[in-house]
């Protein structure tokens, strides 16, 4: 086995272990933020939505800068620094009793993510061969789902005692992850050339096809982020207990572990990437519309199942398509910019979703936010169809397995 092949094989295992630690650290804390501050402390949902939206926008919106710096200086220092910064954000969140302190903790957490997320994504593109990326992204997403359940279960159990224990556990996991990277991650370059920060950013911004694709995905993310805000609140409201939230993530894990990899393997040779992405988005949009009209957990969990199935169809195609469009000379910059759609869509989804949720309650129209999200999903579906029409998009970009 050549040294390059050996590095790729070892790199796969490193990426999987690293991803599990990051997912556990994140999901111990973040699914419980809305429960803690809205249900336990009585804050307005929009106040928590601002905090979650700020974290999302800082982490993803500034990702191009984190990616460009990583292109210049390498992945390791950025990843280690970012993970320690996120640990500091979680520690601060544990003592937050005013909105400004929660916002500051989410700002720190998001800034840490800005530093470590783009280089971690670029490492996947660097180490995994193009024909294997779709399946590897599916494995990562299966791991994300399992980690989300374990993290949410652990966080829910700790929340019975003290929210500070929840935040301390998340902080410790990110400190462990930083030490793991500092010890084992080689000083790999992310790009084929040592791209100056400004040059990497220029390459991305001049790629109109990539920029359009990323911005179009903002509508997709407005729906996707509700698993952190409105869906947990809805489950808690109907069940009357935050303990029920863990079953929402258990559903996601079961569906992902049983369906994600088989669907990805089956569809990658039969359907174009944009068709898989659009099909998943359509299922997600349809499942959102009736949520505000349900009256029991069985109905709600059925719709959540449909939502997760849509995500299972869409996510591997979205990640694979983003990676396939990245310029090898500026991988970090491209993968950083690819998060901008999540920054915009996530921020609007959190803040707008929280505002609409409060508005729906005030007007006794609980279906209002869910109807609006469904409409946004349909508009995004049409926009993607227009962008990826045969007349506008080179065929080789969208081939099955590309």
Curated annotation (Swiss-Prot):
GO molecular function list: transmembrane transporter activity
Keywords: Cell inner membrane, Cell membrane, Membrane, Transmembrane, Transmembrane helix, Transport
Transmembrane regions: 13-33, 99-116, 139-159, 165-185, 214-234, 244-264, 277-297, 300-320, 340-360, 368-388
Signal peptide boundaries: none
Pfam families assigned to the protein according to its UniProt record, in alphabetical order: MFS_1 (PF07690)
SUPFAM superfamilies: MFS general substrate transporter
Primary residence: membrane
Coiled-coil region(s): none
Periplasmic side, ranges: 34-98, 160-164, 235-243, 298-299, 361-367
Membrane topology reported for the UniProt record: Multi-pass membrane protein
UniProt GO cellular component terms: plasma membrane
Side of membrane Cytoplasmic, spans: 1-12, 117-138, 186-213, 265-276, 321-339, 389-402
Protein's cellular compartments: Cell inner membrane
Superkingdom, natural source: Bacteria
Keyword Transport: yes
PANTHER family xref list: MULTIDRUG RESISTANCE PROTEIN MDTH, RESISTANCE PROTEIN MDTM, PUTATIVE-RELATED-RELATED
Family (UniProt): Belongs to the major facilitator superfamily. DHA1 family. MdtH (TC 2.A.1.2.21) subfamily.
Protein name as annotated: Multidrug resistance protein MdtH
């Amino acid at each position: 086995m050549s040294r390059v092949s050996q590095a790729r094989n070892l790199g796969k295992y490193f990426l999987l272990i690293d991803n599990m630690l990051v997912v556990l650290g994140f999901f111990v804390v973040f699914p419980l933020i809305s429960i803690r501050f809205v249900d336990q402390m009585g804050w307005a949902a929009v106040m928590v939505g601002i905090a979650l939206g700020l974290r999302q926008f800082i982490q993803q919106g500034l990702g191009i800068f984190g990616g460009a710096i990583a292109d210049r200086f390498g992945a390791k220092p950025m990843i280690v620094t970012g993970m320690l910064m996120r640990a500091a954000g979680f520690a601060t969140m544990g003592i937050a009793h005013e909105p400004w302190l929660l916002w500051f903790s989410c700002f720190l957490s998001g800034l840490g993510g800005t530093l470590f997320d783009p280089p971690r994504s670029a490492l996947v593109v660097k180490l995994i061969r193009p024909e294997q990326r779709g399946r590897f992204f599916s494995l990562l997403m299966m791991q994300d789902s399992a980690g989300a359940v374990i993290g949410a279960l652990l966080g829910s159990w700790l929340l019975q005692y003290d929210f500070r224990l929840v935040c301390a556990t998340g902080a410790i996991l990110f400190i462990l992850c930083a030490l793991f990277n500092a010890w084992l991650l080689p000083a790999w370059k992310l790009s084929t050339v040592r791209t100056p920060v400004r040059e990497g950013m220029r390459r991305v911004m001049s790629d109109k096809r990539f920029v359009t694709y990323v911005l179009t995905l903002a509508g997709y993310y407005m729906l996707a982020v509700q698993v952190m805000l409105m869906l947990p609140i809805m489950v808690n409201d109907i069940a009357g207990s935050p303990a029920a939230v863990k079953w929402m993530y258990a559903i996601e894990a079961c569906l992902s572990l049983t369906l994600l990899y088989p669907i990805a393997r089956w569809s990658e040779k039969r359907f174009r990437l944009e068709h898989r992405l659009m099909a998943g988005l359509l299922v997600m949009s349809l499942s959102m519309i009736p949520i505000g009209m349900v009256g029991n957990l069985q109905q709600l969990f059925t719709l959540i199942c449909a939502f997760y199935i849509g995500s299972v169809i869409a996510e591997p195609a979205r990640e694979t398509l983003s990676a396939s469009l990245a310029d090898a000379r500026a991988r970090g910059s491209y993968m950083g910019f690819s998060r901008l759609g999540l920054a915009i869509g996530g921020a609007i989804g959190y803040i707008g979703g929280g505002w609409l949720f409060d508005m729906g309650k005030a007007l006794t129209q609980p279906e209002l936010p869910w109807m609006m999200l469904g409409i946004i999903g349909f508009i995004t579906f049409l926009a993607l169809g227009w962008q990826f029409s045969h007349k506008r998009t080179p065929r080789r970009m969208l081939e099955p397995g590309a």
